[in-house]
Swiss-Prot record:
Name this polypeptide is given: Uncharacterized lipoprotein SA0400
Cross-referenced InterPro entries: Csa (IPR007595), Csa_sf (IPR038641)
Record-linked Pfam families: DUF576
Primary localization class, coarse: membrane
Organism domain of life: Bacteria
Length: 261
């Protein structure tokens, strides 16, 4: 009788163990599936990189939904910034945003220089208007600082030299999901041998040998949405309270009409 009870107890423990392991495996499969979906969602735009001539975007179709008015060819918005904290509590951030209207085949935007303090009291922000013609950035505002002027006129978006053809090789990411928004995040460890990392080190002052983290963020439907948003970040930060990263995004949305501004 005692032996039969032990057998029943043993079988119960085995069944429970299999159930727990099965649940764990199920969660792993779900996370792997979401990681793959996030990468596939990003691949729709990253497969276009490098976009050496930004004017090629005038002839590139993006994801369209009911937000687009009839006849609207849409607008590509490309963005790159470089953020660095040289002093505790202070973040210096420079970059450019450019809107390429496929209806008018014109590209306008601005270069920004921000100094952001934790207390926000002494924060500083300055925008310099730009346009693009013949794949060349043209500065529309007067800039006294010659070095800044050269940085603006010679600016290259990350998407102009980045190459993510090997995106599938980024594996075992840390995936997090907020179903309420919805939003999706995935983090992948990069290598200093990665060509994208080498490109960034050659273009920016990155005083650390630490291999960066690739962060992918999506707001909205994974399948695509004109009201959603995708952001790519390559984070070189050495510690939690320091900031050293490059942010990139390429999004397709309805073109803004004058009445909307």
């Amino acid at each position: 009788m005692r032996d039969s009870k032990r057998v029943v107890l043993y079988i119960s423990i085995m069944v429970l163990s299999i159930f727990i392991i099965g649940c764990g495996k199920g969660n792993e499969i779900k996370e792997d599936a979401k990681e793959e979906q996030i990468k596939k969602s990003f691949a729709k735009t990253l497969d276009m990189y490098p976009i050496k001539n930004l004017e090629d975007l005038y002839d590139k179709e993006g994801y369209r939904d009911g937000e687009f008015k009839k006849g609207d060819k849409g607008m590509w918005t490309i963005y790159t910034d470089f953020a660095k904290s040289n002093r505790p509590g202070v973040l210096d951030n420079e970059g450019m945003v450019l809107n390429l209207d496929r209806n008018t085949r014109t590209a306008k935007g601005y270069y920004f220089v921000d100094t952001i303090y934790d207390n926000h009291e002494n924060s500083y922000s300055k925008n310099y208007r730009v346009e693009m013609k013949n794949n060349k950035i043209i500065l529309l505002d007067k800039v006294e600082d010659q070095k800044l002027k050269e940085r603006i006129e010679n600016f290259k978006f990350f998407g102009q030299y980045a190459d993510f053809k090997s995106l599938k090789s980024y594996n075992h990411g840390d995936v997090s999901i907020n179903s309420n928004v919805p939003s999706y995040d995935a983090k992948f460890k990069m290598s200093n041998k990665d060509e994208n990392v080498k490109q960034l080190r050659s273009r920016y002052n990155i005083p650390t040998d630490k291999a960066p983290i690739l962060k992918m963020h999506i707001d909205g439907d994974l399948k695509g949405s004109s009201v959603g948003y995708k952001k790519l970040e390559i984070d070189f930060s050495k510690e939690e309270n320091s900031e050293l990263s490059i942010v990139d995004s390429l999004n397709f949305q309805p073109a803004k009409n004058k009445d909307d501004e």
